[in-house]
Amino acid sequence: ILKISDNKKIIYDVKCSAAVKETILKSGGEAIEWKTGHSLIKNKMKLEKSDFGGEMSGHIFFADRYYGYDDAVYVSLRLIEILSETDLTLSEIVSDIPSYFSTPELRFECKNDQEKFNVMKDLKEYFEKEYTCSTIDGIKVFIGKGWGLLRASNTQPAIVCRIEGESQVELDSIKKIIFSKLSTYKDIKIEF
């Protein structure tokens, strides 16, 4: 996309690995992190006139020669097209993408939506005192060589969490900080 499009903006959601941003920038693109949710990504793509976007969930959107919505068959065909234009294998193409250590998406149930939003407000105040944070969607806390994301679920009374580090040691360290704070909320079920 970056080779053929005049618009270099690529939209991706807050749950994506730091490798996404790094790869976009290395390839000459403009990385725009946005809120999680396929409709939110699509709307941001329209606003930015972006030809490509994606989410950690696997929703991938092409808008350069297509309608700008997620379509697995179309994405597969575009991948086949890319592979047909090179002598490299898919493994060789993606071999330069950095690899990080991360948790799967974790969900911590709250009693109700009100508690979910109260906890998120408190988490934001707590972490912003100590760390650099992004509040695009929830709170993304940058700790050492990684980050922890805490956000209110769009569909349930739950806090959604994802953590990433450059190494297993970094990941474990960030998990300890995030989980230590989450454990102070007596009504949140923390199971991991």
Feature map (PLM): residue ranges:
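Cysteine protease catalytic core and zymogen-processing segment of caspase-like enzymes
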Residues: I1-I4
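Phosphate-binding and adjacent anionic-ligand microenvironments
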Residues: D6-F192
